[in-house]
Amino acid sequence: MSMLCYTLIIVFLIGIWAAPKSEDNVPLGSPATSDLSDTSCAQTHEGLKTSRNTDQRHPAPKKAEDQELGSAANIIVDPKLFQKRRFQSPRVLFSTQPPPLSRDEQSVEFLDNEDTLNRNIRAKRETHPVHNLGEYSVCDSISVWVANKTEAMDIKGKPVTVMVDVNLNNHVFKQYFFETKCRNPNPVPSGCRGIDSGHWNSYCTTTQTFVRALTMEGNQASWRFIRIDTACVCVISRKTENF
């Protein structure tokens, strides 16, 4: 019986010794190692291709200047900012489309009696020449909606960043400014129209006033007074007499 046990043990040991070695213990240069190397190279190549495709789908981060310019459109504005009437200005309009001008290039302004985002408009007092009535303006002015104002001077004389696009209730509104400026500093050769050039020097100039606009302060939107062109006036001075 003992001889049978010894025989079985010897056969078992011989079988283990004759078994093929595992791939983990295969010497360098064996077929198993070559397959693993090929697999690793293929995986590395696929990884490089994947990384290139990822870089193409996700380009490198933009420069700081580009991120700063585009950050304003991503800032969500609290609707409560528009509920205070003292922040509303008749020359500032928030709209999803360019506001129209009335016919004959008359000046128009934004009506904000009920809602800041209301796009109703009304014609203001005529500031351009009305030749058919025999009435003329001392200075010729032009009024336009300015859509892409990014910088302005605040009430303290410091430059501020103006928000071009405003994200409000998941809708992007553009901030428009109704500006008026002189068409020509000298509508007539002598200066302002209708001024006695024999006794007065005159010229037309654009004046500015302050309006409340939505500006950027860090990463937050805030109301500030900024300067915009609002009128064209005539400046006169008495001519000095030569004695």
UniProtKB/Swiss-Prot annotation:
A single cellular component GO annotation: dendrite
Keyword Transcription: no
Primary localisation category: secreted
A Pfam family recorded for this sequence: NGF
Keyword Signal: yes
Tissue and organ expression note: Expressed by the venom gland.
Transmembrane segments: none
InterPro entries for the chain: Cystine-knot_cytokine (IPR029034), Nerve_growth_factor-like (IPR020408), Nerve_growth_factor-rel (IPR002072), Nerve_growth_factor_bsu (IPR020425), Nerve_growth_factor_CS (IPR019846), Venom_nerve_growth_factor (IPR020433)
Signal peptide start-end: 1-18
Propeptide: 19-125
GO molecular-function term, one example from the UniProt record: toxin activity
Superkingdom, taxonomy of origin: Eukaryota
Subcellular location: Secreted
Basic and acidic residues compositional bias, start-end: 47-66
A GO biological-process term: neuron projection morphogenesis
Glycosylation site residues: N148
Region annotated Disordered, chain positions: 47-69
Cystines in this chain: C139-C204, C182-C232, C192-C234
Record keywords, A-Z: Cleavage on pair of basic residues, Disulfide bond, Glycoprotein, Growth factor, Lipid-binding, Metalloenzyme inhibitor, Metalloprotease inhibitor, Protease inhibitor, Secreted, Signal, Toxin
Family: Belongs to the NGF-beta family.
UniProt function note: Nerve growth factor is important for the development and maintenance of the sympathetic and sensory nervous systems. It stimulates division and differentiation of sympathetic and embryonic sensory neurons as well as basal forebrain cholinergic neurons in the brain. Its relevance in the snake venom is not clear. However, it has been shown to inhibit metalloproteinase-dependent proteolysis of platelet glycoprotein Ib alpha, suggesting a metalloproteinase inhibition to prevent metalloprotease autodigestion and/or protection against prey proteases.
Oligomeric form and interacting partners: Homodimer; non-covalently linked.
Name this protein carries in UniProt: Venom nerve growth factor
The organism of origin for this protein: Oxyuranus scutellatus scutellatus (Australian taipan)
